[in-house]
Amino acid sequence: MLNFFRSTYLSLFLFLALSTLVITKAQSNDKILFHDSHFHITNYIQEGIELEFYVDSIMGDKVGRSTVFGLPLQQQWSYRVTGEAAPTYYLDTDAPLYYYSFCDAWIAAQYLSLPKEKQERLDPMIIGFNVTDMYAADHIKRVLTTFPGVFTGIGEFSIHKEFVSAKISGDVASLTDPALDRIFDFCAETGLISIIHNDIDNPFPKPNKPNYVKGFQELIKRHPDAIIIWAHLGLGRIIKPIEDMGTLFEEMLADPAYNHLYFDLSWDETAKWLDYNDKSLENTARIIGKYPDRFLFGTDNVAPDKQEKQLYVYHLYDRLWKLVGEEVTYKVCIGNYEKLFNDARKKVRAWEKANVK
């Protein structure tokens, strides 16, 4: 009888202990506000923060998972232009930007130094390629085969970007460049997910002048097997919404030809345009509510030094989260990320297994 009571009490103790662990884990998950679909670990002079600091201090218990990429462009410090004043941003100087490939190896080295549980929270992206170079796809393949098990996608890379595109040394990026087609063909082959920045319009549009919509649409339709995320909805610091933009997005979202295209709500500048007035915010909420599986959230922060900067961007969208409701907010901030990036991880690892010697 004594052994029976001992066994019963032991079973009860173990049950309560395990229940506490489950509750604690659930409570911990409840603290997570979002997965970050758009995050830069380094800036335009390739300075930033270490990945372990990012996971421990910036993500912490508020950000569950995150993409990780630097910036594929290095700002040149030309003594002839700025003298001893070293530029740290592309607007600090008239000197050009140039493509910088070492960023991929740096991120891979940082990632591989992390313990497994921290690696699982990150999705590194390949960005160190020149989008005008027919060899760009070869660079992406070379990075994958050199660092198998690390990367989930490519990007954020830019085609048309206010003030940046014109500063880059060499050829100007174009939506019709065969080099870009080779990149997306390789993404389709491997399962790499891609994040592309392409402004929806010119910085200072003129009446009756074409914007970048048609060229972008044609590019997307040429690559139905590549999963593509359109960064910032095509908006920017001064790239404002075009006329009937809501109608345009609804038409694209309803068209099966764009079923592989997703949209990220990222950057404080994007929040500014979406919450420009009550009407614009309500229209945005209506469209997202109608197509909740096609949107993701990201901060677009660049190497922040404290967690508050991550949460600041998230809370800029608070009025939107309230309008779309908890279920849609969960999909945009967490669910869609997990669906897309988990699938990409699986496909890329399978490709690596079949192709890396």
Residue positions per predicted region:
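An N-terminally biased module of ancient metal coordination in phosphate/nucleic-acid-related enzymes
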Residues: 26-109, 115
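Acidic (Asp/Glu)-rich catalytic clusters
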Residues: 55-62, 107-121, 140-152, 184-189, ...
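Active-site gating/metal-coordination segments in enzymes
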Residues: 84-202
